[in-house]
A protein has these predicted regions:
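Acidic, glycine/proline-rich low-complexity segments that act as flexible tails and inter-domain linkers
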Residues: 1-49, 97-119
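Residues in soluble alpha-helical coiled-coils and helical-bundle/repeat scaffolds
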Residues: 38, 59-60, 77
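Short, thiol/selenol-centered motifs that function as redox-active sites or metal-ligating centers
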Residues: 51, 55-67
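Iron-sulfur (Fe-S) cluster-binding segments and ferredoxin-like electron-carrier domains
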Residues: 67-79, 105-108
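Membrane-interface alpha-helices at helix entry/exit sites of multi-pass transporters
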Residues: 82-85
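Glycine-rich phosphate/pyrophosphate-binding beta-alpha loops
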Residues: 91-96
Length: 119
């Protein structure tokens, strides 16, 4: 059954393809730079995704938060680890980040490995 995360991923893939096919070199270069920033270096990709989630939350970018939550699930972060990172984002970002943390929790419901335990 499709969910909001599936819809987000489809929309993102479709629009990224359109953007990258528009022929603008600057846009292509920026997308490449953004992608390469998460390649392993002194920090591994897994850590960089968690940093991306924190930065996205502080900056209050819901699409970015969703993307990094999906990636955090893919690279093996556990729900409690992601919640701990969201706590850091909340402390850095302040109370204005609360609605974005709330949406992050809602989004995690649809991500394998980040879903709440059913009790």
């Amino acid at each position: 059954m499709p969910n909001e995360v599936d819809d987000f991923n489809r929309f993102r893939a479709e629009l990224n393809e359109e953007i990258l096919n528009c022929g603008h070199l600057g846009i292509k270069r920026f997308f490449a730079l953004d992608n390469q920033a998460y390649d392993p270096g002194p920090l591994d990709t897994r850590t960089k995704e968690l940093l991306g989630l924190v930065a996205s939350t502080v900056l209050r970018c819901d699409d970015c938060i969703t993307y990094h939550l999906v990636r955090c699930g893919e690279v093996g972060w556990k729900r409690d680890e992601v919640i701990d990172a969201l706590n850091v984002a909340l402390v850095v970002g302040g109370s204005i980040a609360i609605p974005h943390v709330r949406r992050a929790f809602a989004t995690m419901r649809g991500i394998q490995g980040l879903q709440p335990d059913v009790k």
